[in-house]
Curated annotation (Swiss-Prot), chain B:
Topology of the protein relative to the lipid bilayer: Peripheral membrane protein
UniProt-recorded name of the protein: A-type ATP synthase subunit A
Keyword field: ATP synthesis, ATP-binding, Cell membrane, Hydrogen ion transport, Ion transport, Membrane, Nucleotide-binding, Translocase, Transport
Localization, UniProt: Cell membrane
Quaternary context: Has multiple subunits with at least A(3), B(3), C, D, E, F, H, I and proteolipid K(x).
EC number: 7.1.2.2
Amino acid sequence: MKEYQTITEVSGPLVYVETDEPIGYDEIVEIETPNGDVKRGQVLESSDGFVAIQVFEGTEGVGKDASVRFLGETLKMPVTEDLLGRVLDGSGNPIDGGPDIVPDDRVDIVGEAINPHAREYPEEFIQTGVSGIDGMNTLVRGQKLPIFSGSGLPHSDLALQIARQASVPEEEAETDDDDEGSEFAVVFGAMGITAEEANEFMDDFERTGALERSVVFMNLADDPAVERTVTPRMALTTAEYLAFEKDYHVLVILTDMTNYCEALRQIGAAREEVPGRRGYPGYMYTDLAQLYERAGRIEGKEGSVTQIPILTMPGDDDTHPIPDLTGYITEGQIMMNRDLNSQGVTPPVNVLPSLSRLMDDGIGEGLTRADHGDVSDQLYAAYAEGEELRDLVNIVGREALSERDNRYLDFADRFEAEFIDQGFKTNRDIEETLDLGWELLSMFPKTELNRVDEDLIEDHYVEDVADEATAD
Amino acid sequence: MSQAEAITDTGEIESVSGPVVTATGLDAQMNDVVYVGDEGLMGEVIEIEGDVTTIQVYEETSGIGPGQPVDNTGEPLTVDLGPGMLDSIYDGVQRPLDVLEDEMGAFLDRGVDAPGIDLDTDWEFEPTVEAGDEVAAGDVVGTVDETVSIEHKVLVPPRSDGGEVVAVESGTFTVDDTVVELDTGEEIQMHQEWPVRRQRPTVDKQTPTEPLVSGQRILDGLFPIAKGGTAAIPGPFGSGKTVTQQSLAKFADADIVVYIGCGERGNEMTEVIEDFPELPDPQTGNPLMARTTLIANTSNMPVAARESCIYTGITIAEYYRDMGYDVALMADSTSRWAEAMREISSRLEEMPGEEGYPAYLAARLSEFYERAGYFENFNGTEGSISVIGAVSPPGGDFSEPVTQNTLRIVKTFWALDSDLAERRHFPAINWDESYSLYKDQLDPWFTDNVVDDWAEQRQWAVDILDEESELEEIVQLVGKDALPEDQQLTLEVARYIREAWLQQNALHDVDRYCPPEKTYAILSGIKTLHEESFEALDAGVPVEEITSIDAAPRLNRLGTTPDDEHEAEVAEIKQQITEQLRELY
């Protein structure tokens, strides 16, 4: 390995070096500063005799006298089952004071695309115990379902609730028959979150014993921003190893993707690239896709990778490039809502703009319950109508509305108070969620339920609720 | 992707930046296919400046560095054409994904190449010419049963000079065996090649007059597309672009479907791969896959191959058109294609146009959509390519460059609407914004083949919907009850048009496909409600009583009524509506 002391330029996170041998694109670099600090970086551009390096740990202390070593390989993550229960920094080094990691394998963190022909279509229902998700936006194994949130909203609590409660109902029934193979594991990748938030997560993991089956990657707010581009890839490489080599069902929580995208923009700006929308690089869609698409199931493999990335929408604007590009890649989104939050609804999930694209194949007879699809459609339609009428009420008042309209308004209120607002501690199974849905739907006369199959109405309609409503 | 015969020249890598590589000392022409680096990654020449050749590479370039070799094949990006393309799934440069899976497992590795059609499969060749016949370019010389649905026609290649047939084979052959020989010495095989960026020639382009029947009420009923037409489906995420595209791929009455998943989700392509072999084609009853070719370049697959997948798809479509088939091509999503162009362009440091897209964006889009049309082929047959492109505008804002440049070309516009999607009104196609410029030229077909007053009834529905959107503005201010009774009634009728007719459940076994006869019948039921209700109103019946008859809600169930029962059901509902309303006065 040759060492160079030929740095010609340092600019933000980037270092330019002259070389006299060919260097591979994406290759890993070590830079040693005169005072002995070793920083790692990656080749961003390689020309004859000249390379651009992106330094992960910040370029502080790097000058023309620093020496540069090219390691001749791309960035690898050491993987082993023993990573479970460990806490690592954003570059994959242990920070929990535990023993060194003895890897089974070292895997390239960029990851290769799963051949669509080798994928298995996700259709195994994951019960999160949250009605707004299970009933209305069902999560399935192998899905990528982000939480679109805003600053100051309790997205962390929701993510923790899901991590705590997530289960697959069928398997509970036959728990011990299942060999250890299909155990559940959580890979947690934190990018640029505050130490306080990090503590919240860690406390919850420790309190509930979840840490034992988790791998935690921590890049905190004061850690180098460039490292954030590596953290999720480390996390996903670990998740893929656990899922496809060790048969775990892995839930990956990535928070906060907004910080990740900021880091991308920072690098793009340092490289003087032509910026795309709002200064984010033009390749951000491709870059994000390379993360999000690393969820899924593979034919013939036991395990699965399910992703719940969290992002805070700047200004609560879902047309901002970060949520916008994310929404185009992920299979739906769970939207947190500020108004619901200030009304004290927990979790403040607004189901109307939320969506799970894989829901339809994961629910129904044999999977959840035969009436699930129809109930959810009808709840959506009714809540949307009620919500729309609220605007009108503000202008004309309730009295000016018909009995039918008033009923929809009542429904919307009860839907939020009873169906959505369940608290972060309540774990509802899917039966409970659907029965609650029927109780609310039964506020309407049967003829209003045009999204529900007539047979299902006969089976589930709660008669006395309708009587009460008309009696009022 | 067709396999290169020989290496014409070799150069050396000078620099690498993502998918863009420059090489020196390479003698190449624009769009030549080259193999890059020690691993032989496939790429295409996109710029030549002095001694420096710029290449876009179709695979990941990690670890590739200066000094490694670049081999030029001297040929443009070319697809393999021949039997075996249907029932296949390809990546963006026509490498069969099932073959790649066999060779490198579940994850896509680099540097593996495979021909687009299996060269070892035996096909039963049935000649349609005999020795002594004169044939010219494009003529059919024989047929092969490619799938249960499709008879593959073996054509004299478009660039051939033709000649007299001197020898004809019949029986079982692989695609590279010669099946017909001409007096010019030309040998014709089932296997042909064609460069993807060049349109395959035809005699003439004609005005399309036949609809591509989609089985979707809002499309056939309000905004039809012609066989040979072009359509765009723009919409924000979650508004149902992919579901609409897939419904069209499943139920449109095309002979051949080419489905391009361009920069979209892996799981979506898997869904298609799993569903299509199971689902029956409503025209033939055979599995849908028997008429379908899939091209999957998912969002995490190399970006340069995303740029090429659109061309790969349309070239395959043109080849089947040459046989006289009606081909429907779905491109989901053309925005990802445009973004791939933008990404490559920005790596080349080209002067950007609007929003960073290259200045040639509009030209590329129109070149692509112009490859659609209703054509007269050289062999005398007529074939068509209908192109339906999804557009994913950032933030759902239709004023962005890809949507705008697409709208200047396409003649059908199906605008998806996030408000409708949030209310779970699917397909979430906004009836105020959408349009079809084919309506007038297709009406004669509907009149001849479905019903006489197809156009009149559609106009009635459009008028009611227009009136509704005007009234809705007033309702927003004063509430519904403040409106005069006749207007309240119009709103009620419009609600039935929306809920019983425009809405369609793509997941329901019956409702997902609605033949034009049923589309007409459901609407005629609502029209009866309209006419009878107004009769009753004129006779002095209060509007609450009119709207509370129990026959009307049954209209909402018509979508899910089986196709063979709907006629009787509609007739019965009409009769009951009439009876119940007339009882009121």
